[in-house]
Amino acid sequence: MAKGKENRIVITLECTEAKKEGKTVSRYTTTKNKKNTTERLILKKYNPNMQRHTLHKEIK
């Protein structure tokens, strides 16, 4: 059996700018290593509803 698989968790990233404007939010799923990155992720990703790159924050 492989060791260390329990450190990687699946997270959801949600658009913050669309939420403020009241538009449809875009969501992305990705994985992160909770041992190396303990704080919440903030990434710039493409929002197809707004047709531009926006900030996406990790949600629970």
Curated annotation (Swiss-Prot):
Entry-linked InterPro entries: Ribosomal_bL33, Ribosomal_bL33_sf, Ribosomal_zn-bd
Keywords: Ribonucleoprotein, Ribosomal protein
GO terms for cellular component: cytoplasm; ribonucleoprotein complex; ribosome
Family matches, as SUPFAM superfamilies: Zn-binding ribosomal proteins
Coiled coil, from the record: none
Similarity field: Belongs to the bacterial ribosomal protein bL33 family.
Pfam families with a match to the protein in the record: Ribosomal_L33
A molecular-function term among this protein's GO annotations: structural constituent of ribosome
Domain of life: Bacteria
Name of the protein in its database record: Large ribosomal subunit protein bL33
Native source species: Pelodictyon phaeoclathratiforme (strain DSM 5477 / BU-1)
